[in-house]
């Protein structure tokens, strides 16, 4: 029972009038012929010249709703119309599994496509992008709009064609990588995107929250010694893992210090790792260095922390799998392998050294962006998900989107049972198998959701021994994914799925399954996120179907082990509970949710911190990409070149002062290698307007160069083209180096906190200084190369 109205209740009340308008138009639109209904698209486009999208919304939604009915045989319900309106307002619509989010998408996609600027519908994998574009594309094209789809294997020319469509279905990864590639193009025709206008993000929490900690990176290889990674790994395995003593508030206020044991502390709660004083001393001894924190030893410190992190915090068959002499990353939120994705900064090499597989060359980052900064580039964005309210603060703070819960079309009748808590994992697994046997006997379909591949394989083996036929869906067999999910709701089906939460396909029940009680969902442990658990529960009870959900957890599970398993152990002991027997109480479930909330807060803080650092990089990236685009668009940059010449002269004159006078020798050494002017004498520097005369002389010299090129290549505007080409190449060369330098700065910036400085402020200040130095280098290299340009003389 609710005593108070929620934010969602208030917002839904506001849009009920619009929903009513749309429903009242239904009889009128139902009487239109197919041709009359199709002609509405062109009518709306013309009206947009005088009216806003908001003015058109009721009629446009009524039109596409009628088209959905005629083409697909599906008409959006009033609650689905609500979801469509919320999304058109640039918000997140939280809609339960099975409530037809794919159909809802047609409403805001159609409306926003009328502008002609393009709509991107973002999905989490190629399969869903292709499936949804094939199905929903029928409606858009029937209404006179074009619809396309971009998948991983598509070549650039085809991508350009698909981006030119009114509505384009694509994954978040492909969208981000195309943006980066476009900003590395050396010719305008190589660019495939046409701007970031409006996007609809399906599974928006997965894209904007779960994947926000992993930036998109385009990389090349850089030379490095493989032996150093093996050395780091060998030394890391020799160091002793310790524990930190947490302080209570009174100790902290009185100035007591926590004590650290061992050589390093790996905190799985916060996914942090740091060296103790003893560990620092051992590393200094191992590598025969004086001070590990000295700038020249930064690579050793970074390599050792990577090796320790690989050994202490990253787990095989959970964070990654080893296959065919290769370490492959696993998306921990979906259980899918991410082919082609590698950690940067030596982290992947640390894992390869740990697992004893071939060590591949380290990546050099050529271009990078976080999903947070990428999606914030859209003029307007919205999203839909089954579970968004637990992350509402993050959506609002980072993306400026609030989350509105849309009621279900039919009431949810699924039973969510209390958690069963066991002492050990072995007891828990035995209890799960026992429960599966019991439920399976009556034919009720069962879905067992696991956090790792390892657990899915343990349970699979146990079920086989009991003679229970089942399907296994994990990161090792993604090809069979859709087929397995399609069968999971059949009578008598048993399915084990690694992190089923992120699968994106509905489980539909047959009639016998409904009679048997619907889908029985078993969670094998609580996830770090309440949202992921809710996604697993939400697989059952779709569209008013019956169903059950229950979590089996143990005191050895990561979440309980890290957040207060001692408390539960004492409860077991005080109650005298025998081995193999569980505790079940709502209080325990609430305690687990409290622990999850703490982890979520830690992750939010981590993502927010990442964004604050990345914002510095983003400000720099914006400037570089804006200047590159000017060049690619064919804008005349001749005036920019002349400005660079003046800037270089001014800078070199300032650098050549000795006391109160300009040193002619220093100025010749500093300036003439860049701008080949006649040698400057001491007397010249004393003249009035000396700097002005240098500006004039340099430009006259440049004009002579231009005249020479014009004579050799008449009517070809050769010098303008050379200016563009050389500037682009120089910008790219130094920008890639800047990315690398900023990354090195980020790795070591925490050391400044020992000097009572704010790391984030120092990162911004030092990054700004490095960016200015990069700009100077770009100017000097570009101008130097332009003065060296000469026509090619061909023998007749």
Model-predicted regions and their roles:
Residues 321-328, 334-341, 543-544, 556-559, ...:
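Extended, charged helical/alpha-beta scaffold domains that provide interaction surfaces
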Residues 1-576, 625-626, 643, 647:
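Conserved P-loop NTPase motor core
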